[in-house]
C-alpha cells in the first residue's frame, strides 16, 4: 500500500536530528521560504502533540519556540512560549535544562523580539550559573561593542578566547575590531589576518583589515586589499560580506592618501547614481575636492562643481513650477521651504570648495566605522543551522 509523502515523513522522524535533516534537505531543495514553510508547520504540529503527552519536555518546547518563529515570523510569540514554560516548571528544572532555555531566549530576544537588554539578562544568568561558552561571551561582547563600550567588550572577548576550540570566524572578527577600537593595532591585525585567511573575499573583513593596516603602517600589505575592495563597491549593501558602500571606500582611500583612487570612486558613484539633477552634501565632496587639489586637477574640480550646481539649479526650477511637488497637495510656503533646503545643499558644497581651494584646510576623516558581525544563530540545536553527521 502506497504511503503518502507526509505520512511517510511522519513515520521516519522520531528524533530531533531526523527532523533537522528533513528540514535542511527541504531548504536545500527549495529557494523560497513559501516552498519549504510546510516542513516547519509539520514540525510544529508534531511538537505540539508531543507536548500534550509530556508538557515538561525541555527539548520539545525549545524546538517549538523555533518552529513558531519560523511559521509565524514573530519572535515575541516564541519568547512567550519559553517564558511561560519557565514560570510553570522552573522549580522542576535542573541547571542544564534552564541553560538551554536561557540561551534560546537570549538569541530570540536579540534578533527576533528586538530587546537586547533582555538578551544580556539571559546571557548574564548563564554566566552566573557557570554555563559559559564561546557563544555566550562572544554575544555579550557584541552587546557592549554595539554600545561602543570597547573595554567591556574586550573583557568579554578575552574570556571567549578560553574556549578557542568552539570559536567561529565572526568571533575572531568581532574580537579583532574591538582590539582595534581599544588601540591594540598589532593584535587586531593578527586577528583580522586570521579571518582574512579563512574568508579572503569577505568585503567586511577586507575593509577592517585594510583600516587596521593603515594604523600599523603596512601600506604594502594593504595594496592588494585596496585593489580588491574596488571590485566590491556598491550603492547599496545587501550583505555585509559581499558589498562595501561607495562612501566607505572613499573614506578609506582618503585615509591612505590614495587621492587618485578617491577621485575615481567618487566619480564612479556619481555615474552609477545617474546624477542628472540634485545631490546631498556629504563628506565625500570634501574628500573629492581635496583629492583633486592634491593631484593638481584644479580645472577639473572647477568644472565638476559647475556641472553639479547647474544640474541642481535645474531641479530647483522644476520644484518652482510644480513638477516635483504637485501644487494641489503642497502649499506655496511648503514649496518655498523645499527650495530653501535645496539651495542650502548647494551652499554647503560651495563653502567647502572655497575653503579647500583657498586655504591649507584639510578635511579630517573622523567617521570611519567598522560594523560588527552578527552570529547567524545560536539557538540550541536549531534544526536549520545545526551541523549534522
Report residues per predicted region:
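Eukaryotic alpha-helical solenoid repeat scaffolds
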Residues: 15, 19-27, 31-47, 215, ...
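Residue-level detector of the short coil/turn that links helix A to helix B
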Residues: 38, 72-73, 113-114, 148, ...
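Single-residue signature of alpha-solenoid repeat helices
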Residues: 39, 43, 78, 118-119, ...
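Short coil turns that delineate tetratricopeptide repeat
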Residues: 55, 90, 96, 131, ...
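Start-of-helix register in tetratricopeptide repeats
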Residues: 59, 100, 135, 169-170, ...
Amino acid at each position: 500500500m502506497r504511503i503518502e509523502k507526509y505520512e511517510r515523513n511522519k513515520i521516519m522522524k522520531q528524533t530531533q536530528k531526523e527532523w533537522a535533516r528533513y528540514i535542511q534537505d527541504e531548504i536545500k531543495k527549495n529557494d523560497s521560504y513559501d516552498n519549504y514553510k510546510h516542513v516547519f508547520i509539520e514540525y510544529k504540529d508534531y511538537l505540539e502533540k508531543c507536548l500534550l503527552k509530556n508538557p515538561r519536555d525541555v527539548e520539545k518546547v525549545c524546538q517549538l519556540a523555533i518552529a513558531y518563529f519560523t511559521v509565524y515570523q514573530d519572535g515575541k510569540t516564541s519568547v512567550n512560549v519559553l517564558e511561560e514554560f519557565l514560570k510553570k516548571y522552573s522549580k522542576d528544572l535542573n541547571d542544564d535544562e534552564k541553560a538551554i532555555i536561557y540561551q534560546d531566549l537570549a538569541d530570540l530576544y536579540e534578533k527576533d523580539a528586538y530587546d537586547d537588554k533582555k538578551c544580556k539578562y539571559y546571557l548574564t544568568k548563564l554566566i552566573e550559573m557557570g554555563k559559559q561558552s564561546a557563544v555566550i561571551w562572544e554575544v555579550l561582547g557584541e552587546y557592549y561593542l554595539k554600545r561602543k563600550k570597547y573595554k567591556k567588550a574586550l573583557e568579554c572577548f578575552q574570556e571567549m578566547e578560553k574556549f578557542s576550540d568552539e570559536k567561529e570566524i565572526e568571533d575572531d572578527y568581532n574580537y579583532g575590531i574591538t582590539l582595534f577600537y581599544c588601540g591594540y593595532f598589532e593584535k587586531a591585525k593578527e586577528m583580522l589576518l586570521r579571518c582574512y585567511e579563512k574568508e579572503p573575499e569577505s568585503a567586511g573583513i577586507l575593509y577592517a583589515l585594510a583600516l587596521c593596516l593603515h594604523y600599523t603602517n603596512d601600506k604594502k600589505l594593504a595594496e592588494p586589499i585596496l585593489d580588491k575592495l574596488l571590485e566590491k563597491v556598491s550603492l547599496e549593501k545587501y550583505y555585509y560580506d559581499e558589498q562595501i558602500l561607495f562612501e566607505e571606500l572613499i573614506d578609506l582611500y582618503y585615509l591612505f592618501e590614495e587621492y587618485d583612487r578617491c577621485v575615481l570612486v567618487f566619480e564612479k558613484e556619481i555615474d552609477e547614481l545617474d546624477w542628472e539633477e540634485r545631490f546631498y552634501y556629504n563628506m565625500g565632496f570634501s574628500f573629492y575636492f581635496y583629492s583633486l587639489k592634491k593631484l593638481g586637477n584644479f580645472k577639473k574640480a572647477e568644472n565638476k562643481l559647475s556641472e553639479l550646481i547647474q544640474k541642481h539649479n535645474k531641479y530647483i526650477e522644476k520644484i518652482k513650477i510644480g513638477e516635483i511637488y504637485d501644487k494641489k497637495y503642497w502649499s506655496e510656503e511648503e514649496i518655498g521651504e523645499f527650495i530653501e533646503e535645496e539651495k542650502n545643499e548647494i551652499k554647503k558644497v560651495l563653502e567647502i570648495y572655497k575653503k579647500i581651494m583657498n586655504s591649507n584646510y584639510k578635511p579630517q576623516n573622523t567617521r570611519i566605522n567598522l560594523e560588527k558581525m552578527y552570529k547567524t544563530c545560536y539557538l540550541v540545536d536549531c534544526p536549520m543551522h545545526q551541523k549534522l553527521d
